Structures are given as structure tokens and as C-alpha cells.
From Swiss-Prot:
Keywords of this entry: Cell wall, Disulfide bond, Glycoprotein, Membrane, Secreted, Signal
Protein name: Expansin-B6
Entry's Gene Ontology cellular component terms: extracellular region; membrane
Organism placement in taxonomy: Eukaryota, Viridiplantae, Streptophyta, Embryophyta, Tracheophyta
Residue ranges annotated for the Expansin-like CBD domain, each copy included: 173-254
Length: 259
């Protein structure tokens, strides 16, 4: 009888673990399970990493709040990884909280351990501290390269809509901007711009999350922007989001986002 009871409770435990695993898998955008990666950190111990980074995002402000990471070559993926979101779970060090955190890829980590491992995340100091138990952030930051579990998840920026930050070199003949805070996939397959009185024009991804269009004649606003997500192929249109009197370096917020 004792042996039967033991097997019964073992099966219950296995079933509970399976349910938890399936729940985590359902949050992924590509259906893959948890993988293993190396983790380091950079910048100030409580800071948001680099300002802007290779992706050009404003990393310290809401909704990112410094919970960001640079990605090694496989994660950054020549800029395609900009804006994608990952959960990271640390449980191999005594200071680990064993609770997952979510980070957004905002920068590139091209060398050192980032390039020597199949997957690597170089977290901001703030994000690294968030992996730790209360009061153990400094201990975890001084641990060197950590082994963690990671999984791709959908981005979810609550109460935040997609924003367009104009490139410093943008002008009426050359319109370029960074697309920020997309829910869902976090990366885009297509970006199209529609000037006043015109039709939608395909834009080119110049670098990372920056999209551009070169025009033989000046384009005038207000502009509509149509976005297509890379994996789910969902489409949203931000109407009149960039005004006629737009300026370089300014950020224009839409009233839409992917669900």
C-alpha cells in the first residue's frame, strides 16, 4: 500500500510540473521550450545599461524602466532581435531568486562571452539585480558569467502604445524613425508610410529598429504608418501619427498597439 501511495503522489507531482511547463510554453511566440544561456551585466550596478544602444531605444524611461538586455549574436540577430522580449530564470546560484524576469533586447553584445556561447544575454545592472533574492543583487552581479534558463515571450507594455522617434538625420526627402514598444512579436516584417494625399510606401529597415524611405520629392504630413508584425503577421495602422510639422529627434506616440 505504501508503495502504491508513493507512486500516486509521484504521478501527481509529475502532472503538476507538466502543467506548469505547458503554461510557460503557451506564452512563447515560437513554440520552443526553455533553453540555457550565459548571463553577464554591464553599465552601472543599478542602471539601465547603455543609453539608446544599438537599437536606439530610450531604455531608462517607461515602459522599459531599465529592464533591458544586450543580446549576443544569436539573440541580437543583426538587429532583427531589437524589441523582442525574453523571460530569464536564474536558479544555479545561492543568490538567485528562482523567479523569472522579463527583459527587452535593446542593444548588441558582439564580443567576449557573448560571442563564445550559443546564446548570451548581457543585462543592465538593474535587470541583473532583479534576478537576485532581496538584498543579494551585489552578490549576484559579482558572480561572473551565470548559467540561466531563457524563453522567448510576447512583449506586453501595459497602458503603452507604439511610438515613433524621428531619426536625427530625417528630413522631407529622407524620413526615418525608430519604432518602439510593439506588443506581441516585438519585431516587424513591414513598415509602410502614407503621406498626405498619397498611398502607402514601403520603408526599408536601415539598422536594427530604424526604418527609412528615400524620396525624390519631399513628403508632407500628416503621415499614417502601417505596421506588420514579423511572426504573427498582424497589422495595425497609426493614423496621422506623425504631424505635418514634425521635427528630427522628436517622439510621436500613436493610439494603437498590437493586441
Amino acid at each position: 500500500m505504501a508503495s502504491s501511495s508513493h507512486r500516486y503522489f509521484a504521478l501527481l507531482a509529475l502532472f503538476a510540473v507538466s502543467l506548469k511547463f505547458c503554461y510557460c510554453q503557451n506564452e512563447t511566440t515560437d513554440g520552443a521550450g526553455w533553453g540555457t544561456a550565459g548571463v553577464t551585466w554591464y553599465g552601472e550596478p543599478l542602471g539601465a545599461g547603455s543609453t539608446g544602444g544599438a537599437c536606439g531605444f530610450a531604455v531608462a524611461n517607461p515602459p522599459l524602466y531599465g529592464m533591458v538586455s544586450a543580446g549576443g549574436p544569436s539573440v541580437f540577430n543583426n538587429g532583427i532581435g531589437c524589441g523582442t522580449c525574453f523571460q530569464i530564470l536564474c536558479n544555479g546560484h545561492p543568490a538567485c531568486s528562482r523567479r523569472p524576469i522579463t527583459v527587452t533586447i535593446t542593444d548588441e553584445c558582439p564580443g567576449g562571452p557573448c560571442a563564445s556561447e550559443p546564446a548570451h544575454f548581457d543585462l543592465s545592472g538593474k535587470a541583473m539585480g532583479a534576478l537576485a533574492r532581496p538584498g543579494q543583487g551585489d552578490r549576484l552581479r559579482s558572480a561572473g558569467v551565470l548559467r540561466v534558463y531563457y524563453i522567448r515571450v510576447e512583449c506586453l507594455y501595459r497602458r503603452t502604445n507604439i511610438a515613433f522617434r524621428m531619426d536625427p538625420g530625417a528630413n522631407p526627402y529622407y524620413i526615418s524613425f525608430v519604432v518602439e514598444y510593439e506588443n506581441g512579436d516585438g519585431d516587424l516584417a513591414y513598415t509602410e508610410i502614407q503621406p498626405a494625399g498619397g498611398t502607402f510606401i514601403p520603408m526599408q529597415e536601415m539598422r536594427s529598429a530604424v526604418w527609412k524611405v528615400n524620396s525624390g520629392s519631399p513628403l508632407t504630413g500628416p503621415f499614417n504608418i502601417r505596421l506588420t508584425s514579423a511572426e504573427s503577421h498582424n497589422v495595425v495602422v497609426a493614423y496621422n501619427v506623425i504631424p505635418a510639422n514634425w521635427k528630427p529627434n522628436e517622439t510621436y506616440r500613436s493610439v494603437v498597439n498590437f493586441k
